[in-house]
């Protein structure tokens, strides 16, 4: 609700900001229907398919921006949308708002989020049962808060299931497993130099110079 509230208060349409205009496509390419995700950071390993929060957000974006990627993702996950309680009141108010639920025919197999340093690739975005998906991260943002020391790391899934994924589990920010494994580079599909991983700091940044 925040962008709508701020739009009302400030008399500026926050939904026209590039972040909201591109969030639907980013969400669809990161988390295909009925599939694990190829994203990064705390908790990326937990769900087997997009959750109600993600689908509720996709529905919101589709209604407010007309994004076909967000509309397609929301339509493919109707049960999760039904279970979403956070945006339920919004959907009641916006009940008559319709949106496109068809994945664009010209949907690329590859998308590069240059501002955050992530690349997402799909062999068949529209068909999870045939899709091979790869996510790669080398970001100008280092390790801090909900990010981990996984520069130059990748996630690989096939038919919605993990092939190569980061390991471990998140309990709390300061437990031994979180600090020495889950957040450490050794838990991710990246490179250690003489057994040494990347630093736990926002200065431990990376970069993707080109992608094709």
Task: Annotate the PLM regions.
Residues 1-39, 43-44:
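Aromatic-lined, polymer-binding surfaces characteristic
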